[in-house]
């Protein structure tokens, strides 16, 4: 029932947006709406848990309201999500990092709901937020489907991180120091309730027992090569909460993210994450990849890329895991893409059983309204 309701609202908002675009609206509205859908057809050809094929999807509805007609610099944003279909990591591949970054099971949930106020070079955001929407963002790794190219596994798997699909309440302050330097810091609920006790992510609780997650990031928006773009980020995070026996647990780590344009069409990226070996299973993470835009001259908006992600797992008989991904995104038009994708998972490490290397094939498609 909930899925049917969601799809109905999804189509209604999509139709409303299309109708508004067709109509001749002269005055700029403070409201804007958008919707998107991503679908994955995933096949595990060999290795892993078992061979097989599954389908999974992610639908999003977004609404944005700016306050400029009343006061300057205010923005309210809402994002509702629905995930459905199979779980290839859990049921087919058995990997640690997650072959699909939209895998979450069958859920309908409030993903983001926040207010942002800008003051010159400063801005403050308060509400339900995704940490990875602002921190540890890998700009040139967005082509890839494996979850680690979005958020490091050393963050996602070591602490209760407010990331897709389960976000958390938080406050974020950003300072654009200059055109080349930016600093931001945030604090989040340290232990957001899971979907079993909070099925739609609308029942929020804040208490000292849940602790907090603090993160700060400094970004240098300068290129190492003349005439090219580049971005370099360094972040530190600290997590604290009280467990069931009333003892304080502390954890943390740091990360680096580098995006560098090499030529007009070639972009390189790398990620590094480190966290204390004494309290973390995945103490080291690193990645390296490239994204080439317009490989075929007649298709300038297409993207091709190859990337490698390594999750160093030190206290397991299974050992560390490495994912190698190759993707080609065909941009059909401004709103539609199709992306064939191949991943080779060396030593899938997401189960308690030693698994054979897995070869996984994708066809991902996306639609935006």
Regions found by a protein language model. Give the residues of each.
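Outer-membrane beta-barrel pore domains and translocons
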Residues: 36-42, 81-83, 129-131, 188-190, ...
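Short loop/turn motifs that connect adjacent beta-strands in outer-membrane beta-barrel proteins
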Residues: 21-33, 65-76, 121, 180, ...
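Hydrophobic, lipid-facing positions within transmembrane beta-strands of outer-membrane proteins
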Residues: 31, 57-61, 109-115, 167-173, ...
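Transmembrane beta-strand segments of Gram-negative outer membrane beta-barrel proteins
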Residues: 25-45, 76-78, 147, 154-156, ...
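Outer-membrane beta-barrel "beta-signal"
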Residues: 306, 356-369
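Detector for outer-membrane/organellar transmembrane beta-barrel domains
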Residues: 221-314
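Outer membrane beta-barrel
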Residues: 52, 56-192, 280-298, 303-315
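Membrane-embedded beta-strand positions of outer-membrane beta-barrel proteins
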Residues: 33-35, 76-80, 124-126, 173, ...
